[in-house]
Swiss-Prot record:
InterPro entries: Cyt_trans-like (IPR004821), NadD/NMNAT (IPR005248), Rossmann-like_a/b/a_fold (IPR014729). This is Probable nicotinate-nucleotide adenylyltransferase. The keyword 4Fe-4S does not apply. It comes from Pseudomonas putida (strain GB-1). CDD domains: NMNAT.
Length: 219
C-alpha cells in the first residue's frame, strides 16, 4: 500500500473545555497513544444542547485549548463547532469531518462514560455509528448503568479490544483511563474563590486565565 493510500486514524474529543484541564489532556493523550492515532482533535463546543451555557466566551475557550496542545504532536484543535450559529450536534460534526476523509479512513468519537450513557437523548444518536467508531473512557469509579437502548447496541456492536476495531466506523469499545479527580467545575470554583489551580491546568492555560482575568467572582 502506498503512502497516499494509507488509512488515517482520526479521533475527536468534544467538550466545553471551560476551562481545558489535565483530565481532558491526559485522556486525549492516552487514547491517541493506545490507538496509534494520526491525530486526536479537541473540539470545543459552542452551545452544547445537553450542557449548561459555558461561563466564558468561545474565543477564550478556543484559545486555552490551543495553548494546551502546543508542542504535543498527536493533539490538535478543531474549531468547526464554534463557527456554527446554532447548537452543536455531534452528528453534524461527524458528517462534516467524514466528508473530508477518505472512505476507508477510521474516525473515532471519544466519550466519557456519563456522556455515553446519555446518548439516547442526543439528536439522531442512532446514526452516529454510520460515521465513526465510539471509544468510551471508563473509570474504575463509574457507577452509572447504561439504559436498555445502549445495552442492545453494545450487544450488537461491542469490540472487546479497542485496537482491533476495523473498518471506517460501526463499533464500540472501552478504554480504561488514568483516574484524575479534577473537573472544570472544581477549577472554576477555586478560581472564583481566589485559590490557585496550578498543576490542575497546563501552565500556558493558567497564564491565559490570569492574563484575561477569567472565572473571577463578580465584585
Amino acid at each position: 500500500m502506498s503512502k497516499a493510500q494509507a488509512v488515517r486514524r482520526i479521533g475527536i474529543l468534544g467538550g466545553t473545555f471551560d476551562p481545558v484541564h489535565i483530565g481532558h489532556l491526559r485522556s486525549a493523550l492516552e487514547v491517541a497513544e493506545l490507538m496509534g492515532l494520526d491525530e486526536l482533535r479537541l473540539l470545543p463546543n459552542a452551545r452544547p444542547p445537553h450542557r449548561d451555557t459555558p461561563q466564558v466566551a468561545a474565543q477564550d475557550r478556543l484559545a486555552m485549548v490551543r495553548e494546551a496542545v502546543q508542542g504535543v504532536a498527536c493533539l490538535s484543535v478543531d474549531a468547526r463547532e464554534l463557527e456554527r450559529d446554532k447548537p452543536s450536534y455531534t452528528i453534524d460534526t461527524l458528517e462534516s469531518i467524514r466528508a473530508e476523509l477518505a472512505g476507508n479512513d477510521q474516525l473515532f468519537l471519544v466519550l466519557g462514560w456519563d456522556a455515553f450513557c446519555g446518548l439516547p437523548a442526543w439528536h439522531r444518536w442512532e446514526e452516529l455509528l454510520q460515521h465513526c467508531h465510539i471509544l468510551v473512557l471508563q473509570r474504575p469509579d463509574a457507577d452509572v448503568e447504561p439504559p436498555d437502548e445502549l445495552r442492545n447496541l453494545l450487544a450488537a456492536r461491542s469490540e472487546s479490544d479497542p485496537t482491533a476495531m476495523s473498518g471506517p466506523a460501526g463499533n464500540i469499545s472501552f478504554v480504561w483511563q488514568t483516574p484524575l479527580a479534577v473537573s472544570a467545575t472544581q477549577i472554576r470554583q477555586l478560581l472564583a474563590s481566589g485559590k490557585s489551580v496550578r498543576f490542575l491546568v497546563p501552565d500556558a492555560v493558567l497564564a491565559y486565565i490570569e492574563a484575561h482575568e477569567l472565572y473571577r467572582a463578580p465584585n
